[in-house]
Every structure is written in C-alpha cells, then in structure tokens.
Amino acid sequence: MSGESLECATLPDMGLLVRCAEPQDAPVVARVHVDSWRRAYSGLLPQEYLDTLSVEARTKTWAKAFSQLPGQTPTNLVAELDGQIIGIASVGPNRDNDTDTATHELWGLYLDPAHWGAGHGHTLHTGALDVAHASGAAAATLWVLTTNQRARHFYERHGWAADGADKTAWRGDVRLDETRYRLSLRAWAPRTSALADIA
C-alpha cells in the first residue's frame, strides 16, 4: 500500500533501499517510467509514439496512484540508490478474468536505463514478490511485450515461464502484442522481510 511511512528493507550488498512509494515521488518515478519505455521499446514500437510519452502526464498518473487508499491500487515500491529513485515496481490483485484470488500480478517494473545490468532490477523484483507472497499469493503473473526479448530473458532467469496466454493491447492506434508469464510462489523464501509488514 503506497503512501504509508513504513521502513522497508535494504540489501547491504547492493546499497539499495526498497520502500513504499509516496506522492512526492511521482515526478521522479514518471521520468524513470518514460526513460525506461523509450529505451526498452526503441525499435519495437513506433518512434513517433515513444516521442509523445509525457513525463508531465505520467507524473499526474503516478501521483494519483500513490495517493489512493489501501486496497484501491496495487502496492507501489520504489528503489533508491544513494537517495535517488532509480526504479518502480507495482504488484497487486490480478486483473485477468481467468485467474483466482490466490494469483497476484506484477503490474509493472521499470528501472532507469542508466542502471540496467547492475543487479538493481533483481532487488526490486525480489521486493515486489516478497509483498505478493506476504499477501497470501500462491502464484503471480505478468504481461510482457512479446518482442521485448530483454525483458523476457530477465523474467525467465528469475523462474518465470510463459503460460500460453497472449493478448493484444492498444495505446491509441499503437498495437502491443503481449505474452503472459507465470511464477509459483508456493516455495518463495522472502528476502526483504520488512516488506511483509506493508502487504
């Protein structure tokens, strides 16, 4: 649940703090979101669409999400490195009609491209799944752009597997073909225990 002043765990080996997002984080989170989309989807989505992505519009969207009451939105976590937000992850109830309440969803995970490859995505991913597990989830799903091989390889390295479901989403007139991944959390061993208190 975002907006609460709760102490989340740090992983000393990474020097990274994973904590609950707060409304004042919205502008930086929006920049991370837009920058990650532009880098990740370059060559995969029309450049003219990527050029129209607005940090200002995303700031309003994230500020609203971070201000919602518990239970109305997914849990939003930010990753801080040396006091600077470099990532955002959202995890919560599953939005698909063919899943049960024991299956949660990783709604999104975005990392500043300047920090790709340093292991921080792994830490943020771990924190998000710790929250899902602490909430009672037995499994989790996520949707990824089918042609985004970098993201698919990241999730596959973390134990996710495509479950056979595909869908087409639209952003205006831009088509996004997506593939669903699933991960069992039955044997999940939480690594950021303080996050369990915010689920």
Residue ranges of each PLM-predicted region?
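Extreme N-terminal starter segment of soluble prokaryotic enzymes
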Residues: 15-17
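Active-site acidic-Proline motif in GNAT/NAT acetyltransferases
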Residues: 112-114, 118, 146-147
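Hydrophobic pocket/interface hotspot
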Residues: 29, 33
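Acetyl-CoA-dependent GNAT
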Residues: 3-6, 20-24, 34-44, 48-114, ...
